[in-house]
Amino acid sequence: MKIDETTYYSVLGLPTTANKKDIHKSYLRLARKLHPDKSKSNDFEELFKVVVQAHSILTDISSKQEYDAILKRKGLSNYTPLGYKEHTKKQNQSNNLNQQDASKNSKKNDGVPTQSKVTRKNKPYEQQPYGFGLDFNEGSKMKKDKQKGRNTSKNSKEQQGSQETTNTSENLQRNAKGNKNNKNPRKDRFHTLDNSLDTENDNKRRNIKKAKDRTSKDQNTYSHTNYQRKRNKVKFTQGSIRMRNPEATQSNPDLQNDWDPLKDIISQFGNSNIQDDFGIENIKPSSDPRTFELEDLSLDCEYDFVESNSRVRRANMQNVFINEMDRLMINDPLDMSSIKHSLYSIPYTKRQKTSQSTYTFNDQNYRFTERLPRQENSEGPFGEIPSVFESSTGTMENHRSDFNLRGRPETRENDNIIIPEMMHFPDAVTSKEEEVSLKTRFNHFNEDCNRTKEYILKVLKNRISVDKDLSDMMTVPEYHSLILATKSFDVHLSKQLLELNELQFNAGQRYTELFKSIQY
């Protein structure tokens, strides 16, 4: 047995596009052939080790990705083994043959109904024949059973007349058979009894139907309606159904006794002398609710509030006209002291007081103070005024001094950032000593520039952290000028960083040109 060991995929007999399921299937197929328990040859044992290694690498996701990258570099990403190509060709040929056979069979069977083409007709169960609605199947030949046991409610009226004729014809046929074959008289006697019973039942049904028809004709007569009224007299007297010509109902004394207490309650509502629990008199309504006098529209204005037993009583109402309103209105100004006293008298729970916390960051060249947002205290019943509405006098000066420690963009006197000067380069390098000195000076220049760049980046990082901590404070209108100053300082720092990068680029370019022109 030979195995293509070009790639791990070809060891398993698969292309590089195989998925995990195909890898596992091919591994099991080869393991059944090459496992040491199945074959004792040493060659198969070595091949099985190669198959196990290929399976372990291709089933692991990380190792499979690394191996695929190696195959791409080697140009083997689209490699397919020879055995896989032959297998696919055979499979395609077999599929084509199966398709051709299926097409031939379909041509031969044209016009012959198959089971897949047959559909059942949608009918109710009672109307469904014994053949289950199939066109090519014949129904049962027991027409007698169909007529007796399969009669539907829709066709019952139409088939009643036909049943009578069929019963009589069946009786004649059975009697004729009985005369010919007298071997079993019990059987003949049994048939005659059954037929007589059927005819009797049919006659009874016909008589019942005729009686019903006779009553339906007499329903419109006066005697019939009078009978129905007397029959349902109890229902009409109870009031559930109204009659066309009802009789006069007699009064019931029990019902009158039930209405007496309700009449007393209604009569008490009309009495104007009754007062409620709050001392308010009830006004007697007028006879006609739609008519009223102009004097009744006057204002009830005299309000005398008296505190007694935690209730408010209103004095007797009097009619007050509009010209008397000035005399009765209250001219005293509103006193807020009573409202304040009532508010402070409300019980409340005090919260624990918290102090303002600060955090300082110290450095040799940089310092700032982070002021955390102030937590609210509750000295009074409603706490202190929120910090957003307080006047921030003095705090702006403190924060401005914190920003001044970093250096102001207007003047460069307070800046601690010192940009190194451009190093001097000779016109040409003529000796070994000049070359060594040029290298040392260039290294020192790069170290100074990098040190300054580190400091600038550190300042920018701290500036970002301060902006995050003081973002709420910067939205206050008093700090708008401070926002502009800090942002201009950020621009100044970025310009210095750009200047340093340009110096280093120019120095490096000049340094490489000198070393290219060395001639000694």
UniProtKB/Swiss-Prot annotation:
Bridged cysteine pairs (disulfide): none
Principal subcellular localization: cytoplasm
Gene3D superfamilies: DnaJ domain (1.10.287.110)
Membrane-spanning residues: none
Comp. bias intervals (Basic and acidic residues): 397-409
Stored InterPro entries: Apopto_cytoskel_mod, DnaJ_domain, DnaJ_domain_CS, J_dom_sf
GO cellular component, one term: cytoplasm
Ranges of compositional bias, category Polar residues: 152-182
Positions of the UniProt region annotated as Disordered: 82-257, 389-409
Keyword field: Chaperone, Cytoplasm, Nucleus
Biased composition (Low complexity): 91-100
Subcellular location: Cytoplasm; Nucleus
Alphabetized Pfam families for the sequence: DnaJ
Every J domain range: 7-71
Protein name: J protein JJJ2
Organism: Vanderwaltozyma polyspora (strain ATCC 22028 / DSM 70294 / BCRC 21397 / CBS 2163 / NBRC 10782 / NRRL Y-8283 / UCD 57-17)
